[in-house]
C-alpha cells in the first residue's frame, strides 16, 4: 500500500497542490484581493507556507523510520525544494515589493531587527541544501558529506520558527506549536543517533 511506486505516482498531484497556493496568492495580489495590506499579507502567507513545508520535510525523515512508511522518503526532496521556492518568494516580496531593492535599508533592517536576522540566516542555510539536492551532487560530494550538509535543515527549521515567533505580536500559539514540533523531531533524531551503536550491538 505504501510502496515507493505509489508515492512516486502521487508526486504530480502533490506538486500541483503545493504550487497552487503561490499562484492563487499571486492572482489575488494582482487583482487587489489580498486585504488592506496586500504586501504584508503576501509575505505572511508565503513565509508560513515555507515553514510548514520545512516541518513536513522533517516529519517525513522521522516517518520514514517506520517500516510501512519507509518509502515516503521519496517525497522529501520535492517538498524540501518547494520550501526553498516559497522562502525565495517570501524574501523576494520583502526586498522587491516591500522595500523596492533599497539594499542599504534592507541590510540595516536585517542587522537591527532580530526576527529578520533569524529569517535571513535561515534563508542562507537553505541555499546549500537546495543547491546540493540533485543525485549528481550527492555523487560528487559523497553521501557522508552530503548528509552532514543536510543536517542544516534543523537549524533552518529552528531559525525559521524563531523568525515566526518574534514576528507574531499577539497570539503566539501557532509559532509555539511549530517550535514544539521541531524540537520533538530534533530530539527524536538525537535520540536515534545516540542509541544507534547500542542497537547495533
What positions do the PLM features span?
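Membrane-embedded alpha-helical bundles that constitute the cytochrome b-like, heme-associated redox core
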Residues: 1-201
